[in-house]
Amino acid sequence: MASINKKLFSHLNVEDSDPVWEKFAEVEFSKKNIFSDNKAYLVEDGLVRKYYINNTSDIDTEVCAEFYFPGDIFTVGTHGSEGIFESISSGLAWEITLDEVKEMFVVNPECRFVQNYYLSRKLNAAMKREMLLLKNTPQDLYEYLLSHKPHYIQNIPLKYLASYIGVTPISLSRIRKRIS
């Protein structure tokens, strides 16, 4: 049986000997896998996207909201309420039920530190993304990703990247052509 690469998740500040690691179950996933509801995941390998279905027009469209790379953690709540989590590539994750996470908070108050850290990171990232979307053009957003998050450009398929910055794939191609 494989074990979690704890160094990859050292930013969570959980001791290597902490029994919490034993509660995670290994999940190998393939491309286009939809992750189960009411669980938290640690991504060890692969790439996962979070998206919403926009059905305000005649055609349903997918709007990419976030991406998760190795070392990231994400939680999936009730189906559809918080978006859909789908793998972009095959990979490996570690899962734990949200009920088990709640139990850990009761048994071990130190887990609250991890929760607070995770929530503050999520809030800061959401606020930063909102400001980027409000204050910048799609070309500015693409240039920001080029300079600050090149791993997005290198790893995320263009159709998902276009959705993330709020343009069509054709518009993204034009932006890329103007920049180069």
Model-derived features: where do they sit?
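Cyclic nucleotide-binding regulatory module and flanking cytosolic helices
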Residues: 1-28
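Tight coil/turn sites that cap or link beta-strands
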Residues: 27, 32, 68-71
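A short beta-loop-beta micro-motif enriched in histidine and acidic residues
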Residues: 30-40, 60-61, 79-81
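Glycine- and acidic-residue-biased ligand/ion/polar-headgroup-sensing regions
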Residues: 38-55, 71
